Amino acid sequence: MAKESMKAREVKRAKLVAKFATKRAELKATISNVNSSDEERWDAVLKLQQLPRDSARTRQQNRCRITGRPHGFLRKFGLSRIKLREAAMRGEVPGLKKASW
């Protein structure tokens, strides 16, 4: 189980990403726009640097909904491999069954 503080930190990051997503996208569009002047681009770079670090999407880490485990995470289910296996063995995941060949 991950510490509660780690789970809370990820929730905080998710809120920051949502809050600054449009502003970050606008600044990145200005920076990558070929028709923008060098001064506009430079201003956009400086403004982008002023945004909080945790507002970047890449700072977020996928975590298991149950345990908060960051590794072995399966996006399709939102669970770690361990908790997914436990749920599948109990028959709680529709359409998922143990492989045998």
UniProtKB/Swiss-Prot annotation:
Pfam families from the UniProt entry: Ribosomal_S14
GO biological process terms, semicolon-separated: translation
Gene Ontology molecular functions: rRNA binding; structural constituent of ribosome
Entry keyword set: Ribonucleoprotein, Ribosomal protein, RNA-binding, rRNA-binding
One GO cellular component term noted in the UniProt record for this chain: small ribosomal subunit
Family according to the record: Belongs to the universal ribosomal protein uS14 family.
Functional description taken from the UniProt entry: Binds 16S rRNA, required for the assembly of 30S particles and may also be responsible for determining the conformation of the 16S rRNA at the A site.
Subunit and partners: Part of the 30S ribosomal subunit. Contacts proteins S3 and S10.
Name used for this protein in its record: Small ribosomal subunit protein uS14
Species this protein is from: Pseudoalteromonas atlantica (strain T6c / ATCC BAA-1087)
Lineage: Bacteria, Pseudomonadati, Pseudomonadota, Gammaproteobacteria, Alteromonadales
Gene from which this protein is expressed: rpsN
